Amino acid sequence: MILTINEVLTSSELNKLLDGLSRAPFVDGKTTAGWHAKLVKNTVQLDKNSQEWKKAENIVKTALDRNMLLKMAVLPKRIHSLLFSRYETGMSYGSHVDNGFMGGQEFWRSDVSFTLFLTSPDSYKGGELVIEMTEGERIYKLEAGSMIVYPSSFLHRVETVTDGVRLVVVGWIESLVRDPSEREFLFDLDTVRRSIFTKEGKSLEFDILSKTYANLLRKWGK
């Protein structure tokens, strides 16, 4: 399941991020790419050793932790390996698939990838995120503060930025439920039961759906 979520960041959070990143040091993005992805990665990213990195990470993780739609759709166990990436004119990231595990010796699984956009789509040309699927390609270029989440198993790329600067946060989520089809099934169930609760309160139908949801999560969750 591919999902876009609007207004993940408040305007205040977005401004704080942009202000901090404008003064922070960036380094070659190849340092965090897998051995094969290094061949096609041409970006710079926020230096993890800088004072700004922890501040930026805290802002983003706070925003993600409070987003109910993200929690329902992804069932996060751990949000990890955040990268603050900048694409200047001429930069791109060729077709690749994300590593199955990240975090060095921690071995955190990457079930879901996300891109959180920090710059307006009108402020740069090119730089589209392209997700390569069996049925064709899907192209995304979202508003600042919005994000896209998608299974980490997909090939994807970022087209060349031909003018301006593309600034994004990318990261990965280890889900309580690793199978994407099972996550989508649970998301649909959760959406329906919440809709019923809004209309009818704690009805018999709501209780039955909640029982089914809880038992499937118990069965599929890890």
Curated annotation (Swiss-Prot):
Residues 78-175 form the Fe2OG dioxygenase domain. Binds 1 Fe(2+) ion per subunit. The keyword Metal-binding applies. One of its GO terms (biological process) is intracellular iron ion homeostasis. Keywords: Dioxygenase, Iron, Metal-binding, Oxidoreductase, Vitamin C. SMART domains: P4Hc. Pfam families: 2OG-FeII_Oxy_3 (PF13640), PKHD_C (PF18331). Its EC number is 1.14.11.-. Its cofactor is Fe(2+); L-ascorbate. GO terms for molecular function: 2-oxoglutarate-dependent dioxygenase activity; iron ion binding; L-ascorbic acid binding. The keyword Flavoprotein does not apply. InterPro entries: Oxoglu/Fe-dep_dioxygenase_dom, PKHD_C, PKHD_hydroxylase, Pro_4_hyd_alph, Pro_4_hyd_alph_FE2OG_OXY, RmlC_Cupin_sf. Fe cation binds at residues 96, 98, 156. 2-oxoglutarate binds at residue 166. It comes from the Bacteria. This is PKHD-type hydroxylase PCC8801_2196. It comes from Rippkaea orientalis (strain PCC 8801 / RF-1).
